[in-house]
């Protein structure tokens, strides 16, 4: 089990979530099969979203930090920290805000669309 950051569709809804990367947790949390949006430059933080879902997903009302600020995401966003061996490691909301505190907005991904 590893802690990750879940950015739900609702504005400002950012939380810690504990997941099993090799189990069905990714499917359950993303509400479908997952795909990668990308990785923040100079970090080991990868960004995932739902690729295919049987559920009705909504546009995520939160903005990611640069260079992903303009990325339009349907459904939840999951941030996973990977170590130098590409193994997932704990990453919390507090870690996320510390990492991106130099961004222009007070809360890097809580600004409405």
Question: Residues of each region from the PLM?
Answer:
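Domain-length accessory/inserted modules outside core catalytic folds
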Residues: 1-113
